[in-house]
């Protein structure tokens, strides 16, 4: 049996971007995850702990450095998928500063990976 976890608004920072200066200092990013997990029974030990998945998403954004937002979204999705019991992950990575500088409500990239 599987179930889906929706983890939204995971705020973090990282050094990502293709434009000059974007990697010079950390920028804000927000990650949303849709994670399909295996569920055995009503015990935490039988599924994926959402706190661990949130920590993984933050660590990926903070650790790695990519030119493309799309590449960052794939890295987050793949790192979350690596956890036991995770079957499928959709990760959306929002870059608020890019939205503001382009006078739009939001700029984000999404990636979906599965076993």
Where are these regions (language model features)?
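N-terminal, polar/charged subdomain of small-to-medium soluble alpha/beta proteins
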Residues: 1-115
